[in-house]
């Protein structure tokens, strides 16, 4: 996505980031807003009234959008709100960041609802949200030649690099991220002719509520790299899997 080749995009790039109220999502909002070529950042959160840190960002290019990915009505309203702002320009980037991690203990009976929760948010909600924004992505692709979906995945979703479960019982999370990677691959093929690309990115082990403070990366270290990586994506990276440093990952 070489912006120099598309002068019409300068100061008009629109980016939607889900799960933007904290952690990696919040960090991505801050980092992407540092790019002067970005015109609008739509930061989605389940509950806008509780997104206090997000609300403290004073940049007028950022628009907070309330969206619960598990609610069809909420997703519909969010897309309508974004559409009102972007009009005929569409959405250039959709960053599916919202996610949960609910572990299971193999030494106890497994609760089906805990396993399902990982899939509901990490897979199903992402599919629903991506499809809902398809029209706006297609609009941008028709105007500029391409649009980009970015799925924030995890190395724990890599089947090739799996080392079994962990003491924290991450298997359901790993399964959901492996499924998300399949979604990335299929979207990259199914929407290729429309100019819509899709790529998975592993953000690293990050110091968030999910990752814990013992993690090796700060939010800024991870998201500053991801923000640069996102704008490097092009037709050669469609349907592939990278880490925050833009190194290729194995499925």
Regions found by a protein language model. Give the residues of each.
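Rossmann-fold scaffold of SDR-type NAD(P)-dependent oxidoreductases
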Residues: 18, 90-99, 122, 151, ...
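N-terminal Rossmann NAD(P)H-binding glycine-rich loop of SDR-like oxidoreductase domains
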Residues: 21-30
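Conserved glycine-rich Rossmann-like NAD(P)H-binding loop of the short-chain dehydrogenase/reductase
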Residues: 33-52
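Rossmann-fold cofactor-recognition segment
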Residues: 57-73
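Conserved Rossmann-fold cofactor-binding substructure of NAD(P)-dependent oxidoreductases
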Residues: 69-88
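Conserved mid-core alpha-helix of short-chain dehydrogenase/reductase
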Residues: 74-77, 125-132
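Catalytic loop of short-chain dehydrogenase/reductase
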Residues: 100, 104-119, 124, 134, ...
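C-terminal helical subdomain
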Residues: 200, 212-251
